[in-house]
Amino acid sequence: MEKYINNLKIKLYKNKFIILNILLSFIATIGIIGYYHIFTSYDLLSNSFINIIIFVLFTNLFNKIDWSKKQNNIFGSIFSLFLSSILILGTQLDNNSFINWNIITLIKIICLTFSIIPIIYLILSFLNKYKTKSKIINYKNVSLGTFIFIILFNIFVFLAIYPGLYGYDAGFQIFEILEKNVQLTSHFSYIFCLILANTVKLGKIMFNSYQIGFAIYCFLQMLFLSFVSTKITIYSLKRTNNIYIYLFSVLLFSVFPLYTVMALSATQDSLFAGLFALVILNILDMFENKNYWKNFINPILLSILILFACMIRNNGFYTFLVSIPFIILFKKDKKWLTLLIFLIPLILYKIYSGPVYNLIGIQNTDTMGEMLSVPSQQLARVYNYNNTVFNNKDKTLLNKYYTDVDKFTEYIFRQSISDPIKGLINNNNVSNDLSGYISLWAKIGIKDPKNYTEAFLLNTLGYWYPNKNYSDLRMYHPYIEYDMMNAKFWNKNYIDIKRSSKFKAYDKLLYLTLVKNYWKKVPIISTIFTMGTYFIVFIFLIGIAILRKKWQYFIPLSIILGLYITLFLSPVGLFRYCFPILMILPILLSLIISKNNIYLDSL
C-alpha cells in the first residue's frame, strides 16, 4: 500500500510538471503570435497550422528545463523579460513611432518572455557544459596566416571602392588643416585631421594627386585595423580553442561589409575603434596574463592607448572616465597603480584639449547642443504631441532657451536625429541659466514621462533594437555611408575625391548590400548587421559575469558601458559611432563561451 502511494505521488508530481509545461508552451506560442501580430493579421496567425508545430516545439523545450537550477532560471527569466521588452517596444517604435501603453502590450511582453525562456535556458546549459579543450597550436603561424588572409580580402574591398570612402566629414577635416585662413576648431579630432590632411597632401607632393594621397591614408588605416583584428581573432582563439569562434572572427574581419567598408572609410571613428579594441585587449591581458606586470611596457602602453583614443574621439574621455569607480570597486591587486594608469592619460588629455589647444590656436566649439541632444528631443516631442503641458511661463522659458520654437515641428519628421532641434539651442542663454533649463526640462518630464521616454527610445532606437529597419527617414542619414561625398557641392574649395573602382563587380555587390539594404533579405545573417544585436550580446555578457561572479571583468565591461552611455546621449544612431562594438564582438563572445580562469601569454 505504501509503495502504491509513493508511486502515485511520483506520478502526480510528474503530471504536475507535464501540465505546467503544456500551459507554458501555450503561453509561449501566444507570445510568438502576439509579436508577429504587430506585422500582420492576428486572425491569419491565430488560425495558422504552424502554431501547432510551434506549440509542440515549445513543449519539447520546456521539458528540458531543470527547474531546480534556481540561479540559471532566475537569470534566464530576467534576461528573457528584458529581451522581450526590447522586441515588443522596439517593434512598436520602429513601425509606429510610439508605444501602446496598455495592458495588451504588457501581456505581449509577458507571453513573449515565456517564448524566450527555454532558448536562454538551452544557451546557459550549453555554456555550463562547455569546456575549453587544450590544443597545441602554433599561434605565431596562425597569427601570420590570419593577418595575411584578412589583408588579402580587405584589399579586394580597397580595389572595389578605390581610393577609399570619402565621407561627408572628411572634406572639411582636410580643408581646415590645409587652408591657412580657416579657423581650427575642436569639433573634430585635431590629431586625426592632421594625419588625414597631411597624408592626402603627401600624395599631391609625391604623385601630383590628392586621390593617391587619400588612397594611401585609407590603405594605411586598413593595415592598422587588420593588425588589431588579427590580435582580436588570436585572443578569441586562445581563450576558447574553438574553431567556430576563430572562423567567425576571420570572416567578420575579411568579408563582413560593415567592417571592411569602415576599415577603408576616412573617419575618426575607424581609428578610435582600433584603439578602443587594443585598450580592451590590454586590460584583459592585465587579468589573464601572469607576466603582465613583469613587463613595464604593458601598463605604459595601456596609458598611451587611452590617451590616443581620447585624442582621436573627444567623447573618449567620458568613455574611460566611467571605468574609474569600477577599478576602485573590483580591482583587487595593484588597485592604485591601475588607477594611475587610467587617470594619467585622462589628465594629459585635459591638458591637451585645454592649454595645448589654446597654444595651437584651436577654438573650442560649444558642446552645449551635443550635450542637450536628448533633452531637446524630449522637449520637442512634448511640444508637438502634448502642448498643453506647457503653461505660458514654460513657453516663455522655452523661447528663451531656443531661438525659434516654431521650428520644433521639424521633430515630427526627424524623431531619430536631434540635429534640427539641438541646432535651435541658444547657447548663451542656456549656459548663463543652466539650472533654469534643467528645472524646465525636469518639470515637463514629470508632467509627461510617456513622451519623454518615447523621445529617448526613438533617438537611440538603432543602438538597442536588433530588428531595426533601414533606411529610416526619421534619422535622415544612411545607416552606413557608402556613396562618396560630393565635395564641390558643399564647398568649392574642398578637395574633390572621386570613386574609381578597380573591381566593379564587388563595388556593385557592396552597393546593393549597404545602400539598397539587401542585407535585410538574408535571415539570421541580417541580425549581425544591426547594432541592437551587439547591445543584447553586451547585456548578456554582463549577466553571465554576475552569474559566474567574474567581478574583475566589470572593469573592461565598464569601458564598453561608458561608450554606450556616450552613444545613448548622442544626436543620432549611426553605425560608425558603434563600430568599436563590432570590432570587439569576437571578444565578447569568447568571454561568454569560456568560463575558465585561464592565463594567456602576452597579447
Where are these regions (language model features)?
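Start-transfer (signal-anchor) and selected internal transmembrane alpha helices
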Residues: M1-A28, F49-L83, D94, F98-N154, ...
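Membrane-interface anchor segments at the N-terminal boundary of transmembrane helices
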Residues: G34-I53, I212, I216, N459-P556, ...
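Membrane-interface alpha helices of multi-pass inner-membrane proteins
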Residues: N298-R313, I324-P325, L343-Y349
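Membrane-proximal stem/loop segments at transmembrane-domain junctions that anchor or position
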Residues: G361-F503
